[in-house]
Amino acid sequence: MKKTELLNSEISEVVARLGHKDLLVIADSGLPIPDNVKRIDIALTKGIPSFRDTLNTVLTELGVEKAYVAREMIDKNKKLYLELSEQFGDKLVIIDHEQLKEMCKNAKAVIRTGEYTPYANIVLESGVEF
């Protein structure tokens, strides 16, 4: 059995296959996911699993160079925005929500959580750990 926190085999496989600059999205329950992008749907019900729990677990295995969130999060989900700002520092990049949705088209996968708060989406750009 794995010793790390991330137990979901689909997510773990995607993370293991990411190369430098590849994109992985962690999404709330409402973000549209392009048909051509791998969907890993772990949503059970409203709020379960949460965006934060999912993100923090994925980050136990993923090195991140940049993290992109929608500008709309600043006003519509300020608490989450402040938490992510503290967590990612200057790696956090603010873009428009429409740009974020466009980036999803190039993602290796989108992880759909049960998160039920507005604009709780992040595009993670894989970094290099050496």
Swiss-Prot record:
Pfam families per the UniProt record, alphabetical: RbsD_FucU (PF05025)
Annotated catalysed reactions: beta-D-ribopyranose = beta-D-ribofuranose
One term of GO molecular function: monosaccharide binding
EC numbers: 5.4.99.62
Signal peptide limits: none
Gene3D superfamilies the record matches: RbsD-like domain
Pathway it works in: Carbohydrate metabolism; D-ribose degradation; D-ribose 5-phosphate from beta-D-ribopyranose: step 1/2
Record-listed substrate binding positions: D28, H97, Y119, A120, N121
UniProt-annotated catalytic positions: H20
Subcellular location field: Cytoplasm
One annotated Gene Ontology cellular component of this protein: cytosol
GO annotation terms (biological process): D-ribose catabolic process
Keywords: Carbohydrate metabolism, Cytoplasm, Isomerase
Family: Belongs to the RbsD / FucU family. RbsD subfamily.
Subunit structure: Homodecamer.
Function of the molecule: Catalyzes the interconversion of beta-pyran and beta-furan forms of D-ribose.
Name of the featured protein: D-ribose pyranase
Biological source species: Caldanaerobacter subterraneus subsp. tengcongensis (strain DSM 15242 / JCM 11007 / NBRC 100824 / MB4) (Thermoanaerobacter tengcongensis)
Organism ancestry: Bacteria, Bacillati, Bacillota, Clostridia, Thermoanaerobacterales
